[in-house]
A protein has these predicted regions:
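RNA pseudouridine synthases
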Residues: 1-138
Length: 138
């Protein structure tokens, strides 16, 4: 069931659950964007196609807030905002673990390489060509 956190004429923010995908991929699973379109179509009795822009995504294995643009103008403005403030925006991931870590505080750094054929990313301990650095602090 779709959990709408906020909506107005320009944007709609929803809670993405773990394992939901934001946009269609080769898995064929129904993306959150289609669920939001169906919600808007039904709630506002919209005929035809519903416009919905996707200015950002949240990875499939995690939950979080996703903001969708309800108009092309809102999408343009959100894209510009995300681009201009890229260095100020950060993602914070909270993890639930079965056992306490050995240390109370540590910083872990890994290097992520995406495999587009399998639609997965792999983490490495050492830098690799084309890898993106990922840091975890706890």
């Amino acid at each position: 069931m779709l959990e709408v956190l906020y909506e107005d004429n320009h944007i709609i923010a929803v809670n993405k659950k773990i394992s939901d995908i934001v946009q269609a991929d080769k898995t064929g699973d129904t993306p959150l964007s289609e669920e939001v379109k169906a919600y808007i179509k039904k709630k506002y009795n919209k005929p035809g196609e519903v416009y919905l822009g996707v200015p950002h995504r949240v990875d499939r294995p995690v939950s979080g807030v996703v903001i969708f643009a309800r108009t092309s103008k809102a999408l343009t403005r959100l894209n510009k905002m995300f681009q201009e403030h890229e260095k100020e925006i950060s993602k914070i991931y909270w993890a639930i673990v079965g056992n306490l870590p050995a240390e109370d505080h540590a910083v872990l750094t890994h290097y992520l390489v995406r495999d587009p054929e399998k639609n997965k990313s792999h983490a490495y301990n050492q830098p690799k060509t084309g890898a993106k650095e990922a840091t975890l602090e706890y």
